[in-house]
UniProtKB/Swiss-Prot annotation:
Belongs to the protease inhibitor I3 (leguminous Kunitz-type inhibitor) family. Potent inhibitor of serine proteases plasma kallikrein, plasmin and coagulation factor XIIa. Weak inhibitor of serine proteases trypsin and coagulation factor Xa. Does not inhibit the serine proteases chymotrypsin, elastase or thrombin. Inhibits kinin release from HMW-kininogen by kallikrein in vitro. It comes from Paubrasilia echinata (Pau Brasil). Keywords: Metalloenzyme inhibitor, Metalloprotease inhibitor, Protease inhibitor, Serine protease inhibitor. GO terms for biological process: negative regulation of blood coagulation. InterPro entries: Kunitz_inhibitor_STI-like_sf (IPR011065). Coiled coil: none annotated. This is Proteinase inhibitor CeKI. GO terms for molecular function: serine-type endopeptidase inhibitor activity. Signal peptide: none annotated.
Length: 30
């Protein structure tokens, strides 16, 4: 659930706060 989850969360752009440490991005946080 790395790329698939990332794409899904990125699409929503609101629930990307659980994998910011794993990806080092935090799209939802920004």
């Amino acid at each position: 659930f790395v790329v698939e989850t990332e794409n899904q969360l990125m699409s929503q752009g609101g629930r990307y706060y659980i994998l910011p440490v794993i990806y080092g991005k935090g799209g939802g946080l920004g």
